[in-house]
Amino acid sequence: MTKIGVFLLFLQSMKNKDKKLKSFEKSLEVMDMLREECPWNRAQTNESLRPMTLEEVYELSDAVLKKEEDNLKKELGDVFLHIMFYSRIAEEEGRFDIADVMDKLCEKMIYRHPHVFSDTKAADAEEVSTNWEMLKAKEKGGNRRILSGIPDSMPTVLKAYSMQDKARGVGFDWEKKQDVWDKVKEELGEYEAELEALDKASSEDEAAAARSRAEEELGDFMFATINAARLYGLDPDTALNRACDKFRRRFTYLEEKTIRQGRDLHDMTLEQMDEIWDEAKARGL
């Protein structure tokens, strides 16, 4: 490429960066006006925003899974709004502002990517991930526990996967992924045994104890199954979401066909419902 070509690319890059900075500045100005002039926005706190933030993150997740580009852009904006919201509240309280948030982010990204910003070498993504966890622990003076960064309120499937993945980072993992199936079968057997004990319980106290044990064994079985998915490179959360979507499609088909036929699901036998369900399945729903 000629020198003038390189110069033109540089000018275009600066123009794009200027556009992004102006949009960011405009977003901050809108946030400032909302906090100053809108009663609802003025009334919000970190605590009141939290459930709405979770909802926005799930809506973003849906947009990603469904590959809805226009909706993805919208949901990213909604999540970004919440980041500005929390930062503005902190600024009003004299704790920090959005600049501090961005500076902290940049500081962390630079520190945890020495293979990009210094002379450290990383052969592949696996090595990058291992280095990331080591640097994260070093930030806390080496006293940070491996699983301490996993939020208690994290959805349980993701929490289990994250725990297993972090344990893998220090070598606590199956040497051969095929060996995990013995654990899955073992946990399934223990779960079935407790269910049988629950069925045979002769008193409320006995049933309560058996139910508690069965619940614990169910958790162990699910944890082992999630571990198996991880070892084979599968995302258990995505897999379960796909199963839920499939069930929704087929059940909706069953419900809508029943309505068109002038019938009510409550009055149908399981065999009648299964017939329509199999029809939905045959249609690829």
Describe the function of each predicted region.
Residues 5, 10-75, 81-218, 223-285:
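Flexible "arm" and connector segments at domain edges
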